[in-house]
């Protein structure tokens, strides 16, 4: 600070170029120089430059601390951003896996439904064929029974027309003998 004061005094040397005696109180340049030197002396006596330097040092330390905090916050923000990006990628991958799994399950369910439908159709078709076969067998049986009934009725009618009482009596006796022979 002393060097600064000396430099300020030397910088006032252009005031020496004024006309008239320099050390006169009527010379304004001399008065201004005296006031400046007195002001500088008061500042030095009150240790203002040291205080200013102390405040500037404190401010520089505070700025340095804030810069370090800002760097730490920036690094923390980068770390959080990287973590967020990783988590977002993981969530996207998990969502893709869930969609693929759901798609596979839906396809499997569709295939199972198709297989179940085919099996149901096959069962119904088999049941219908069984019903048709049963109906055919019933119809054939009914036709045979009807044919047997018609044949028996026709044979009975034919026999009753052709049979005489003596032939009927002989036929009955012969049938009785045949039954006795079979049972004994």
UniProtKB/Swiss-Prot annotation:
Compartments (UniProt record)? Cell inner membrane
User: Is Membrane tagged as a keyword?
Assistant: yes
TM segment ranges: 4-24
Question: Which GO molecular function, any one, fits this protein according to its record?
Answer: proton-transporting ATP synthase activity, rotational mechanism
The entry's keywords: ATP synthesis, Cell inner membrane, Cell membrane, CF(0), Hydrogen ion transport, Ion transport, Membrane, Transmembrane, Transmembrane helix, Transport
Q: Which PANTHER family match?
A: ATP SYNTHASE SUBUNIT B (PTHR33445:SF1), ATP SYNTHASE SUBUNIT B', CHLOROPLASTIC (PTHR33445)
- Assembly description: F-type ATPases have 2 components, F(1) - the catalytic core - and F(0) - the membrane proton channel. F(1) has five subunits: alpha(3), beta(3), gamma(1), delta(1), epsilon(1). F(0) has three main subunits: a(1), b(2) and c(10-14). The alpha and beta chains form an alternating ring which encloses part of the gamma chain. F(1) is attached to F(0) by a central stalk formed by the gamma and epsilon chains, while a peripheral stalk is formed by the delta and b chains.
This protein is called ATP synthase subunit b 1
Origin species, per record, is Cereibacter sphaeroides (strain ATCC 17023 / DSM 158 / JCM 6121 / CCUG 31486 / LMG 2827 / NBRC 12203 / NCIMB 8253 / ATH 2.4.1.) (Rhodobacter sphaeroides)
Name the gene behind this protein: atpF1
């Amino acid at each position: 600070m002393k060097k600064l004061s000396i430099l300020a005094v030397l910088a006032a040397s252009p005031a020496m170029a004024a006309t008239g005696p320099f050390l006169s109180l009527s010379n304004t340049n001399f008065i201004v120089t005296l006031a400046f030197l007195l002001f500088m002396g008061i500042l030095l006596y009150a240790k203002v430059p040291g205080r200013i330097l102390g405040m500037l040092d404190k401010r520089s330390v505070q700025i340095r601390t804030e810069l370090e905090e800002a760097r730490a916050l920036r690094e923390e923000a980068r770390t959080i951003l990287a973590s967020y990006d990783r988590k977002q990628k993981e969530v996207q991958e998990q969502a893709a896996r869930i969609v693929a799994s759901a798609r596979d399950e839906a396809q499997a369910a569709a295939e199972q439904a198709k297989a179940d439908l085919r099996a149901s159709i096959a069962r119904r078709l088999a049941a219908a064929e069984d019903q048709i076969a049963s109906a055919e067998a019933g119809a054939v049986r009914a036709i045979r029974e009807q044919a047997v009934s018609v044949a028996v009725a026709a044979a009975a009618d034919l026999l009753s027309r052709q049979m005489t009482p003596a032939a009927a009596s002989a036929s009955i006796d012969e049938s009785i003998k045949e039954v006795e022979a079979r049972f004994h």
